Amino acid sequence: MPDVTVKPLRSKANAVINLMGALGGLISLALIAVLVKEQGSYLPLFAVVSGLMLLGLVIFLALVKEPELNRLREEAERKYNITDDGKDENEGTEKLGRSKLVSMLFLLASVLLWYMAYNAVTSSFSVYAQKIWGIRDGSFSLPLMVAQVAAIVMFIPVGMLASKIGRKKTILIGVALMIFAFGAAFFLGSNLFGVKIDLSEGIFTEPMFYLMAVFFAVCGIGWATINVNSYPMVVEMSKGSTVGKYTGYYYTASMAGQIATPFLSGLIMDEVGMEALFAYAAVFMVLALVTMLFVFHGDSKPVPKKDKLENFDVD
């Protein structure tokens, strides 16, 4: 995406990418609900998903003409006088200035932390939902589907919001929403205030399920808000020649979080119980909020000649 998209439009472009990814995730969750029965085989699910991935690869290879898209990006940058380099004390070199380097490190730390929070929930939720809330068979996918639908609805709007108020402020709003959602979900599974829910008799007959669905919708909105803007913030600090390198930094941080958190959260839940899952996620989101406050670069810049650029025809 950053290779073929001018910098001012990368949040909106990333919103489209995340929208399509969320639609894919929603399809997967629907397949789980349909194909996975109680103590059933996962083979049909894996077969269908593998087939869809191969179909996606064929479409990508056949239809995405990257050199032509890159040429059109360069034409747009020249036409609208968009510079690909940020101005800092080391302009003209590949190294970041000190201020940008500090921002980059804190931003990557934030990426690591919020992936540790979110992936802990998604990787352990099926077990949590069955043991703590009593959800049976593939119905555990329904709360996650609520989050995905909420994210799908919000991907494009949050990309537009970032162009108005900035990526950092938009991300901070998303982190705050996820802290609220994870904290609320923790209380629904902890029985601290006598509100622990039991869905063993069916999810739709329990009024508390609908409250839980609201919290998961808030979580989905928060995650969309973060995801749409975090990657563009990283590559905003790159130059045309270093986009691949900075993309690697971003995915190293995100993958490290996703790899580490199942192990770490599993150790904690083994010691204190499954009820700790959402508390764990909320704590890491709070840490991500703190590190994000120290990020001062990578925000979106005003779009020159906005009305013309946003309608730039690439056909």
Q: What are the roles of these predicted feature ranges?
A:
Residues 1-5, 225-238:
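Intracellular juxtamembrane helix-capping segments at the cytosolic ends
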Residues 11-36, 251-261:
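Glycine-rich segments within core transmembrane alpha-helices of 12-TM secondary carriers
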Residues 34-51, 267-285:
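A membrane-interface helix-boundary motif in multi-pass transporters
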Residues 36, 153-167, 193, 269:
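Helix-to-loop junctions at the C-terminal end of transmembrane segments
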Residues 68-109, 308-315:
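Juxtamembrane intracellular "pre-TM" segments in multi-pass secondary transporters
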Residues 123-140:
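Short amphipathic helix-loop junctions that connect adjacent transmembrane helices
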Residues 164-176:
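Cytoplasmic membrane-interface "Motif A"-like loop-to-helix N-cap segments
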Residues 176-205:
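C-terminal ends and interior cores of transmembrane alpha-helices
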